[in-house]
A protein has these predicted regions:
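Conserved C-terminal portion of the radical SAM core fold
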Residues: 1-33, 48-54, 101
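Short, solvent-exposed polar/charged micro-motifs at secondary-structure junctions
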Residues: 4-7, 33-35, 67-74, 152-159
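Short, electropositive alpha-helical surface patch
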Residues: 4-21, 75-87, 160-164
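Accessory C-terminal segments flanking Radical SAM cores
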Residues: 31-145
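Short flanking/linker segments adjacent to small metal-binding domains or redox-active Cys/His motifs
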Residues: 134-167
Length: 167
């Protein structure tokens, strides 16, 4: 909010002549970024902003998509919104992340990591570790959030910063 939300319409306008797929991501809490719910420019607010100037339609959503996709009528490109905070999609997320130092995470917000690199270096089978990572996945948002009035609240995030996770 109040950082670059004034550029949303410009990015959507860019999809008119360019076959690009623009993604808007809600502000997410990570170590050091001073996140709060008040700073989140939500999925609904993004769509409200887009509808000030454009008529759009929702595109097909696959089971494990993390973004809701849209096309403005007459545009060759598309735009999408990753609504991590206002409309979490955790129940359909099938993503695993491998960090640059060989740790596997089952959620961007998860504080737990599984050491894949050491197993690879020791010639061990990594399939049990991948299964462990999947089974340890929390129900929502890495298990680090509580909900107050339907909005996720952060007590104290225990995690790497996004630049150290990759993504």
């Amino acid at each position: 909010r109040n950082i670059n939300d004034d550029e949303i319409l410009d990015f959507v306008a860019w999809t008119k002549e360019q076959p690009v797929h623009v993604r808007f991501i809600e502000f997410m809490p990570f170590t050091g970024n001073h996140w709060s719910n008040e700073k989140v420019f939500s999925y609904k607010e993004i769509l409200d902003r887009v509808s000030e100037k454009f008529t759009y339609s929702k595109l097909h959503h696959e089971k494990h998509d993390t973004a809701m996709k849209f096309r403005v009528n007459g545009h060759c490109g598309t735009f999408a919104i990753i609504s991590t905070m206002s409309q979490p999609f955790c129940s359909g997320c099938n993503r695993l992340r491998l960090t640059t130092d060989g740790q596997m995470k089952n959620c961007l917000f998860s504080k737990s990591e599984v050491d894949i690199l050491s197993a690879l270096r020791n010639g061990e089978d990594i399939l049990p570790l991948i299964k462990q990572c999947v089974w340890e996945k929390e129900e929502a948002l890495g298990g680090q959030f509580t909900s107050i009035n339907g909005k996720p609240e952060v007590a104290e995030i225990i995690n790497r910063s996004m630049i150290h996770i990759g993504g």
